[in-house]
């Protein structure tokens, strides 16, 4: 839709409360000018493209003095990329200097504005093609609130194994394909086609079989993990049993065991962020439901004070899809002030839900007070890392410690600006390198061997508060955070993380994500069935310096660790760490697995559970190059190895109080789990104490298992057993 020719009426309003999205969002429009996007042609019926109308409404808002609310009357608004604002932008952890993706399409763009509320009014935003859903660029006091969002045809393809088995000696799968995807069976391949653009009629993207990357979600256990994709190795597509199904047969006779699994597939180019805050301050996102973010997640970059509250990152299960994000959900790269993430749900991303870090730049040359620096990771470049007046710190890559005398103020910077490449320059060189002039001469060690050092902007390091959130069905880590300012991770629930729930690195070897932590509190969280280790300090230093850990001042208290085995805490290069008043138990859960096919009278089969073994042998704690560690007044259930392993440190650095832990020696207790079984209709089939089911007569029965785990009496999921009367 085009811009309205007449100026729409300005609508001063008072307070409103709009509910329905993660509680109620309170909007105080007193003294604000409210601009209605439908006055500019936006279509709340969802029939027309509203991109140009939304852009026109925002352009008008820029001409209005004072606080402004851009309002979407309740409805469904489709936004196609062709008529959105375009900007050349370079974004952390995406495509680096690749010129093929330098131009971003932005659905809702707040640019060079102040005191703006984007109020969705409870509406649904439907995105098409490749675009950033919303962005704030060089703006302040911006709020995005009160809408849900989804994608018509995400570039992540989710397929469900509807059935699997063996027929005539050949294994097969039948896969369900959601309505949103266009596909074609081409010989022995499946070709996937994205939605077709209105201008070209061509699909926005195409792919074959399992693309470049795959992970799998098990709805029965609500777990997601990275894995190779077994659906599309050598095989033959036979026919379509039903609409939007493909039957795939294989050359072997091993029955697939993945009925019900959802395979999530994509290629790996992070061409655009899902949302972006660039050189902006006091940006708030609240009361949203984000069904899918293409390319990457919400990125804060060289910005200040960002708040995310009551946001649900979760796909609409009615769509047949489960993936809610192409990669991370939230990435804060070089942010100052406070990053506050509260009361939100993170479900089924393709990478880490939260990653908060700075960026280490490699020093390549040094002369007196001048440094040459370079972005090292291919996914990050093109934007400035320093402004005049910022503080720079040089870090020795071998120790990951600040170099003595190498902290200075920035006087001037020559390098990428984040928004373009000067004519006649090589894009890769220009976008990846910069020259920084400091207010003092560099130390002799840096001048002699600049390649041994990396640089961090310590001005753009935030205070972090992550509280009241839920992390579930995550294939990676839950929270990554590296900032020297206070970090509080409190009252969150982590369920079934596939890697460390909390990961603290400081990396000058791979991703070059900075820096050290100096004040971390992890309190009141629940870690259910976590991966090992649950909390992981893992800086990339090659050498340890006694008494100078990379990370320090960490308090971990009053948390519940409900384990299926493994290590609670692995601390490398960390000091001044206290682990106290925590509770460690076995995860009280029992899952029962049974036959996938009907039995015949007289048949027997065995049902199995995931009951834990009598004891776990992994040490509960490991420390490497650590110092001043206190483990005190924690409680431990039976069945664990209450062992503390140490390396590259003196054992006297570990203080144990009332925990009964053993240093570098096993301390294993046993807690055998007795499982009992029952059949709801024993006349149809019986089950004995070993889980052996015997079919007696035609009909259906349910088998259930029970056990006491971690002091809690638990009942398994029921397994249906069907007994046929004829052989």
Swiss-Prot record:
Repeat among keywords: yes
Catalysed conversion reaction: Hydrolysis of terminal, non-reducing branched (1->3)-alpha-D-galactosidic residues, producing free D-galactose; Hydrolysis of terminal, non-reducing alpha-D-galactose residues in alpha-D-galactosides, including galactose oligosaccharides, galactomannans and galactolipids
Keyword entries, A-Z: Glycosidase, Hydrolase, Repeat
Keyword Repeat recorded: yes
Known uses: Specifically cleaves the branched blood group B antigen at neutral pH with low consumption of recombinant enzyme. It is therefore a good candidate to participate in the development of universal red blood cells by removing blood group B antigen.
Disordered as annotated region, ranges: 220-241
Enzyme class: hydrolase
PbH1 repeat residues: 336-358, 461-483, 484-506, 517-538, 551-572, 574-603
Record-listed E.C. numbers: 3.2.1.n1, 3.2.1.22
Coiled-coil intervals, chain numbering: none
GO molecular function, one term: alpha-galactosidase activity
Lineage: superkingdom: Bacteria
Sequence similarity: Belongs to the glycosyl hydrolase 110 family. A subfamily.
Protein's job: Alpha-galactosidase that specifically removes branched alpha-1,3-linked galactose residues present in blood group B antigens. Has no activity toward linear alpha-1,3-linked galactose residues.
Protein name: Alpha-1,3-galactosidase A
């Amino acid at each position: 839709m085009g811009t309205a020719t007449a100026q729409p009426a300005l609508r001063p309003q008072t307070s409103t409360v709009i509910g329905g999205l993660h509680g109620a969002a309170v909007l105080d429009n007193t003294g604000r000018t409210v601009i209605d996007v439908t006055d500019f042609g936006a279509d709340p019926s969802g029939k027309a493209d509203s991109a140009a109308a939304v852009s026109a409404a925002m352009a008008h808002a820029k001409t209005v003095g004072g606080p402004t609310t851009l309002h979407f009357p309740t409805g469904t608004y489709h936004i196609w990329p062709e008529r959105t604002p375009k900007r050349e932008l370079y974004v952390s952890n995406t495509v680096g200097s690749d010129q093929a993706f330098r131009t971003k399409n932005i659905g809702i763009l707040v640019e060079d504005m102040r005191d703006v509320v984007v109020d969705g009014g409870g509406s649904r935003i439907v995105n098409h093609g490749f675009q950033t859903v919303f962005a704030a660029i060089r703006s302040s006091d911006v709020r995005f609130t009160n809408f849900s969002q989804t994608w018509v045809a995400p570039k992540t393809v989710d397929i469900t194994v509807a059935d699997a088995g063996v027929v005539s000696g050949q294994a097969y799968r039948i896969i369900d394909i959601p309505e949103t995807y266009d596909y074609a069976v081409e010989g022995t391949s499946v070709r996937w086609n994205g939605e077709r653009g209105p201008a070209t009629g061509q699909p926005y993207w195409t792919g074959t079989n399992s693309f470049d990357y795959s992970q799998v979600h098990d709805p029965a256990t609500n777990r997601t993990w990275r894995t190779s994709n077994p659906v599309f190795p050598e095989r033959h597509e036979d026919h379509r049993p039903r609409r939007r199904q493909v039957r795939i047969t294989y050359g072997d006779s091993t029955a697939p065991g993945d009925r019900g699994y959802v395979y999530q597939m994509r290629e790996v180019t992070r061409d655009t962020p899902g949302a972006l805050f660039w050189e902006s301050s006091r940006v708030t996102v609240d009361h949203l439901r984000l069904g899918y973010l293409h390319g990457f997640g919400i990125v804060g970059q060289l910005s200040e004070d960002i708040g995310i509250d009551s946001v649900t990152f979760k796909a609409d299960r009615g769509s047949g899809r489960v993936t809610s994000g192409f990669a991370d959900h939230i990435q804060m790269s070089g942010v100052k002030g406070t990053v506050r993430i509260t009361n939100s749900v993170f479900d089924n991303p393709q990478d880490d839900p939260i990653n908060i870090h700075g960026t280490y730049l490699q020093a390549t040359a040094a002369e007196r007070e001048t440094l040459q620096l370079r972005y090292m990771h291919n996914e990050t470049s093109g934007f400035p890392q320093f402004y005049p007046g910022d503080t720079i710190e040089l870090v020795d890559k071998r120790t990951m410690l600040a170099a003595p005398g190498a902290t200075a103020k920035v006087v001037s910077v020559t390098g990428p600006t984040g928004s373009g490449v000067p004519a006649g320059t090589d894009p890769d060189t220009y976008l990846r390198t910069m020259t920084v002039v400091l207010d003092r001469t560099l130390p002799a060690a840096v001048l002699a061997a600049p390649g041994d050092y990396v640089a961090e902007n310590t001005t753009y390091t935030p205070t972090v508060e992550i509280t009241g959130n839920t992390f579930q069905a995550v294939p990676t880590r839950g929270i990554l955070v590296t900032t020297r300012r206070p970090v509080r991770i409190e009252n969150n629930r982590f369920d079934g993380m596939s890697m460390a729930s909390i990961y603290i690195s400081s990396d000058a070897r791979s991703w070059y994500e900075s820096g050290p932590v100096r004040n971390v509190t992890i309190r009141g969280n629940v870690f259910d069935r976590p991966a090992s280790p649950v909390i992981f300090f893992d800086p990339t230093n090659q050498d340890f310096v006694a008494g100078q850990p990379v990370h320090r001042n960490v308090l971990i208290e009053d948390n519940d660790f409900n384990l299926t085995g493994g290590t609670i805490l692995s601390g490398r290069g960390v000091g001044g760490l206290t682990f106290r008043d925590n509770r460690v138990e076995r995860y009280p859960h029992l899952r029962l697995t049974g036959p996938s096919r009907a039995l015949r009278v007289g048949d027997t089969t065995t049902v199995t559970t995931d009951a834990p073994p009598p004891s776990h042998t992994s040490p509960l704690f490991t420390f490497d190059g650590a110092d001043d560690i206190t483990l005190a007044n924690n409680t431990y259930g039976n069945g664990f190895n209450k062992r503390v392993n140490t390396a590259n440190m003196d054992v006297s650095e570990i203080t144990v109080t009332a925990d009964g832990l053993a240093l570098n020696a096993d301390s294993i207790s046993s807690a055998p789990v007795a499982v009992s079984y029952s059949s709801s209709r024993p006349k149809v089939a019986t089950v004995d104490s070993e889980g052996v089911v015997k079919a007696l007569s035609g009909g259906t029965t349910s088998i259930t298992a029970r056990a006491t785990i971690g002091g809690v009496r638990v009942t398994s999921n029921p397994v249906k057993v069907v007994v046929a009367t004829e052989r």
